[in-house]
């Protein structure tokens, strides 16, 4: 049978050249390496960020976690969190504006009953009543007063496991944290002259920009990262923050390796990204009171800037993804103000900026590895847009702001009017900021995000400073250009070929003759006859077979067989032992994980459909284990694959392994399997449909899950090539005898061929449907 091809792939039953095996062993060899970390290694901490290796520091990038710094007294900058890391109980920080706010924070150890303690706050000994009933968590308490000689009141306790606290001056307020970790949240105190509040810390501390508040909250709730992620290894004096360090050149080209024809170059670059948003505002027809659409669209921007004394010409394309659709309907009258749809970007949206410049780094950006980037954040604030109505006061949209935070970098291709450029795509996640936006003179107000009406607010561009580093494979001769075939990476070349091949394969489905297909499905196809359409020599076929197996052994089908071969019968018997539908669902764990893509439905056993669908995914493996004389879905799948390979003009040894593996998993996704018990048939499909019926009358009977599970264990599993719906349709229109029905139920190829040769429209349509399901 044609499905022998899949059996051979699953059982490795094919011959290979010894040279192929040696090459495979050589490429997968492992080597033990001993590293002496030296006397300065922080061996108590594990590395957490695996990057491209050394990327030189740059003054353009603001660190996320700046510190640690030693205890000191200073005026913290506005808009920066001061993350406090105390080691002992007591007063950890105090601050005052010397007018109407004296604020201090006290740390209390776990398991402290209510008692009075003496603390020195602003140089004066104060009696404070404290307690901490938690057995494991530390308690931070804010004590505050509004007059110099007043008494302290306690506010905003924070119960903390990591023993971290944070304070920030921003927006006329002093912000702190309260609640209980790992769910602590921010709160605030009002203060006049808040920007002049001096802070005195009595423990080590870090500085985190407000743009990274989410990181600060993560640290408060879960603790600091390993020491390798902090700026300093040991706490330094705060004055060290103002020292301009001597840094290595940030813009440099380093030869990583070199041969006679090729070399690997590491390019480190400081970059300035300038971008702007573009929008489209469309008015509806009529009297001029209605707008149909206000949307974002991609925006190109070209500019020059200086980098190390060199003028750089750069090009950016800004686009957005994950827009939120809003609308406003002022009424149904022709003179009522209406906006059918206006787009807003919020925290669930992304901004993509494709960047290219005329430096050497982008000249040969084809084969690239070890790509890394660091970028500052930027806030984008919207402006006003007037809706010019023919009569009456004009509504106008105003406000809205988001901040952009770097979320990754990939390779991309920019398409301009004249040329396509290999470039870097920087991805930014968004956070909503103040102010909110509103449509004035309407009821729409207090919404957050950046609307598309006026996203640039009169600015020519927004600007972000940053740097990137990459290693590129380029010709050793700098005058040569890297050969490129409309691709960005080596893998993308293959993806492009596979994409074209998939389109060709799917188009070939209509050229397959069904009578020939069934004849081919009955032939015992082996590995080498499968590939005869590509190469005629046996040696080449052996090599192709090896490559196909290497790819196929990582497929979900192969992995599910390897984990299930020994447990199929046990799984089925465990199903049959269940005493109810719910217990059946909870005991089918061995039947559920048919591949890494299929979720475990033992947690959702609310219907028979769920269980039968899950079991039916396993039936393909059971059918393979107990081969019958009838045709199965894999026979048709392999026959279609063979036919398409022979007809294809784009198939090659390079793309064949991917195509065979894809075909085994994606061809005929909607399958149904049946088991026969005397005159009763149980049929279940991967789509969750299930039927039980009698052979002689095709009358449906109640579906017994327990009986179905028992039959699956002991009886052959048969592919429902002609499913129940088709059988019933055939019987209602033509009438079929009991023996003929049994032959169709067993997927007898001789009977199927007879129906096809007679041009029976019902059977022919069913086979055509299966062929059309053989798509990639």
Curated annotation (Swiss-Prot):
Which residues are tagged with the site Binding to sialic acid? 101, 190
Write out the ranges of the annotated region (Spike body and stalk (antigen domain)): 248-479
According to the record, the residues making up region (Hydrophobic) are 389-409
Give the disulfide map. 203-216, 318-380
Q: Which residues form a coiled coil?
A: 484-511
GO biological process, alphabetically ordered: permeabilization of host organelle membrane involved in viral entry into host cell; virion attachment to host cell
User: Cellular component GO terms, alphabetically?
Assistant: host cell endoplasmic reticulum-Golgi intermediate compartment; host cell plasma membrane; host cell rough endoplasmic reticulum; host cytoskeleton; membrane; viral outer capsid
- Record has Disulfide bond as a keyword: yes
Pfam families the UniProt entry points to: Rota_VP4_MID, VP4_haemagglut, VP4_helical
Region described as Spike head: 65-224
Motif residue range(s): YGL motif: 448-450
Membership in a protein family: Belongs to the rotavirus VP4 family.
Task: Provide the protein name.
Answer: Outer capsid protein VP4
Q: Which organism is it from?
A: Rotavirus A (isolate RVA/Human/Israel/RO1845/1993/G3P5A[3]) (RV-A)
